[in-house]
Amino acid sequence: MDPPRASHLSPRKKRPRQTGALMASSPQDIKFQDLVVFILEKKMGTTRRAFLMELARRKGFRVENELSDSVTHIVAENNSGSDVLEWLQAQKVQVSSQPELLDVSWLIECIRAGKPVEMTGKHQLVVRRDYSDSTNPGPPKTPPIAVQKISQYACQRRTTLNNCNQIFTDAFDILAENCEFRENEDSCVTFMRAASVLKSLPFTIISMKDTEGIPCLGSKVKGIIEEIIEDGESSEVKAVLNDERYQSFKLFTSVFGVGLKTSEKWFRMGFRTLSKVRSDKSLKFTRMQKAGFLYYEDLVSCVTRAEAEAVSVLVKEAVWAFLPDAFVTMTGGFRRGKKMGHDVDFLITSPGSTEDEEQLLQKVMNLWEKKGLLLYYDLVESTFEKLRLPSRKVDALDHFQKCFLIFKLPRQRVDSDQSSWQEGKTWKAIRVDLVLCPYERRAFALLGWTGSRQFERDLRRYATHERKMILDNHALYDKTKRIFLKAESEEEIFAHLGLDYIEPWERNA
């Protein structure tokens, strides 16, 4: 730690000249009038501050030289929210309203984008609870969230996309993925549950004291959290990221149609790059894998919400051409509010169960083939049986008819500013899954296909262990009463389980 008042003890440094970098933004240059930024020099330094101020002003941001009551956003580097508040209290300037306290990474992202970007948990600076308590004496407050009851089940927690603990959850997601690649299910579940509960917290963990009372954080998990708090990274995660096997499996499984068994085979054969795999004449690829290689660049790029909405319009047009009363619902991450995804899932159902419905997906495929919109498809026939009990496995696949396909999305269907096209291309390959379910099972199918994966796992686990019921994408069965419980909506399923309803955008466990 630097000695107090070190600036008075060290030799005086020549102050940089106040060039245009420190001049206030001129009104004609300001594009974003409602946003007033002040960059804190503490721990950043004069030169870097001046550099960032100039960059931000060039992009049309209003950046103040001095703190004033007009400031709406305070940006700092290597400071906590508590550090910034302490600095603010030492200033004589009265700030009329509480400004946003943000890490410099937010401003850098704004500069790159040329416009204000969304403020998320990773940008917001954290104020220590003990600091806020000591600086605001008064009546007792609600106990910190960490010591309140947090459920071990994701279905009893509200998890939005505002992740305040991304530095930890990213680490556990990597460790869980590595365990999945090694088929170490127990450790995979341990890390997935840890990441899930941390995503639900409305505050950032900044000390080990903050982890007290939080479920799903065993000694190994806490050890990793402590290391990240102290060193800024986990040595175990670093080792995984540098591990040749992990890197190879990550690469191989990015190909549509390639799973763990194939990845293991290729790795044991000595392959480490996709170019070597593709050029090897001894390997035989499935139709799905051939399509995965053929459209690889498009398929590994993210699908934007605008692209997903464009696909949705085309799916509905095709379905309604054959079944006008059908309900077509976008599920998966996009239903949970995500702006990006790797594929687009749709649930299709119709009040009238007819032969037309059974042939629907094949008719849609034929239509798209004629229009040149279909690059690949694999139609899986239904094996659904009405009287079959729900599966006891938390990761069980359903038995509905479904189609896994690669759709050719025309460029003119999407706003160019909202898509991720390769330059010069007039279309993009998009992964799409269509699921056709009986109308009376639509609530169960919708709940299952909305996700997230961990939310669904915990929902099924909760049903089994806490309610003596079995739940899957087809049905809910009460083992005590020995009856199937009917549901017209997701809300009714939650009610059967005795759970508060969790909105789709709160299921990002």
Swiss-Prot record:
Binding site for a 2'-deoxyribonucleoside 5'-triphosphate: 333-338, 342-345, 448-449
Region Disordered, residue ranges: 1-24
InterPro entries: BRCT_dom (IPR001357), BRCT_dom_sf (IPR036420), DNA-dir_DNA_pol_X (IPR002054), DNA_pol-X_BS (IPR019843), DNA_pol_b-like_N (IPR010996), DNA_pol_lambd_fingers_domain (IPR018944), DNA_pol_lamdba_lyase_dom_sf (IPR027421), DNA_Pol_thumb_sf (IPR037160)
Subcellular location: Nucleus
SMART domains: BRCT, POLXc
Nuclear localization signal (motif): residue ranges: 11-17
Modified residues (Phosphoserine): 134
Domain BRCT: 27-124
Domain of life of the source: Eukaryota
Ribosomal protein in keyword set: no
Effect of residue 343 to E: Nearly abolishes enzyme activity
Record's catalysed reaction(s): DNA(n) + a 2'-deoxyribonucleoside 5'-triphosphate = DNA(n+1) + diphosphate
Cofactor binding, note field: Can also utilize other divalent cations, such as Mn(2+) and Co(2+) (in vitro).
Chain intervals for the UniProt region annotation (Involved in DNA binding): 258-262
Cofactor(s) required, per the database record: Mg(2+)
GO cellular component, one term: nucleoplasm
Residues holding Mg(2+): 343, 345, 433
E.C. number: 2.7.7.31
Subunit structure: Interacts with PRP19 and DNTTIP1. Forms a ternary complex with DNTTIP2 and core histone. Released from this complex by PCNA. Interacts with TRERF1.
Chain's role: Template-independent DNA polymerase which catalyzes the random addition of deoxynucleoside 5'-triphosphate to the 3'-end of a DNA initiator. One of the in vivo functions of this enzyme is the addition of nucleotides at the junction (N region) of rearranged Ig heavy chain and T-cell receptor gene segments during the maturation of B- and T-cells.
Protein family (similarity comment): Belongs to the DNA polymerase type-X family.
Record protein name field: DNA nucleotidylexotransferase
Source organism: Homo sapiens (Human)
Gene name per UniProt: DNTT
